[in-house]
Structure formats: structure tokens, C-alpha cells
Amino acid sequence: MDNDIKAWLFDILSAIMEIESFFIDRPKEFKKYQADIRTKRAIERNIEIIREAMSRILNRDQSIEITNSRKIVDVRNRIIHGYDSVSDDVIWGIIIRHLPVLQIEIEKMLGE
């Protein structure tokens, strides 16, 4: 694996860890997330970072498979190009369902 891909994988992992850090001192509760605009915007920004790094990886090496990469790319595009069309439910689904899987995959890739 080339050094650029490793760096982008670390970017993804760092963004996931930052998102997780918002929930260290409190449980992951949708209502609290929904009411906290600063946390929502910070998470959206980290999803943008994840998407950009993921896009660069896939452009460099199309043989790399990342689960749900298309969904993450699509959500990032909706964040960038239409804030009003990104529902809290969609972002929350990424936080709860997709990021834990992505974190495991990235850690495994970095460990190889």
C-alpha cells in the first residue's frame, strides 16, 4: 500500500475518532444529537473529510473495497450541495451503523 493511501486511511480513522469523541461523556442519543447544532456541524465536517479521503483512495486504487463507500460519498455530496436535504436521521444512521464498520475495516487495512 502506498504512503498516500495510508495517510488517507489515517485521515478517515482520525475523523471517525473525532466523531466518537463527541459521545465520550454522554450516551449516543438521537434527541441530544439533534438539539446540538455545533456537534451536528462538526460531525458533518468530519463526514466530509471521510468522504474526501475515501474518494482519493478509490481514485488511486480501485481494487480497494470499502463497505458503504457509495452511501458515504452520496451523503457528503448532499451536505455540500444542499444543507436542507440532509436529514438528521441520515447522519445519525451513518454514526450508528456505518462508522463502526468503517472503523474496523480501516484499522484492519492499516494493520496489514
Tell where the protein language model's regions lie, with residue ranges:
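Solvent-exposed interaction patches of small proteins and small membrane subunits
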Residues: 1-112
